[in-house]
Amino acid sequence: MQLTSNSDKITRDYFDSLLIETRYVDAGLPSTEMTLFGVTFRTPVMTAALSHLHNTALNGMTIYARAAALSGAVHWVGMGSDEELEEIVATGARTIKSIKPHADNREVVRKIEHAVKVGCMAVGMDIDHAFNGKGGYDDVFGLPMKAKSTEELKDFVEAAGVPFVVKGVLSVKDAEKCLKAGCAGLVVSHHHGMVQYAVPPLMALPDILSATGGEVPVFVDCGIESGMDAYKCLALGAKAVSVGRHLMPLLKEGAEAVAGRIDEMTAELAGVMSRTGVRTLDKMDATVIHRRAF
């Protein structure tokens, strides 16, 4: 294997290093239904928290949301205006709003309150957008960012009143602090290779699950391109997976095309479930996964 600093390539290599065994005896047709925060979805394949999709397709953000609604998937949304979020929720997509770690906590709380008011099922924060990679805090389109403390996360959890999910967790230390703050879920992610040599989210998952002890759902983000990729995450204990960049090229073809790929990935997932003796998502078994050593 050729070594690289590219975290996306490292993540892809890790996915491809995991093999599965089959289990046909006593197997049957599977269900991919998933319940999250009291809502039932047809698939654990979620849309990832993307932003600024108008640069990819006209009305890209609402197309993306409509696709999630058509597929019965959880929809995540990233940075954007209040009006855009209202349009997204109006599509009928059950939406989780991920908020940037704005330096001004009043802006964070304002965005939380607006998201709850318009009907988002949950809110959260991508904590990994705090720094610029050059030793300073990040600045996103002129908006200053800042790392958040455990106490600040507690304040956001209390302000939300709905589940608060933290995205960008890639260590046991951060996972433990998020639990201490009262967060209702974690997204294991390196934000599309924001840091070189980052641990693949799927590699970090088992230790994070061990540390959290099943108290909150844990999701996997980054590099998921197929139902087989999703299966590997779910088998190792993830509640659901986020798919973003893999879907972006389809936005120009409309919501139906994006939904079609989500549906295909869900069917691929079901295909692997049936061949490994898994009838429901809560019966996933990590012992079907083997790490390639040749």
Language-model features: where?
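An N-cap/entry alpha-helix motif that binds or orients negatively charged groups
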Residues: 1-41, 283-284, 290-294
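Short glycine-enriched loops at secondary-structure junctions
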Residues: 51-53, 78-84, 128-129, 172
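Alpha/beta enzyme core
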Residues: 66, 70, 90, 103-220, ...
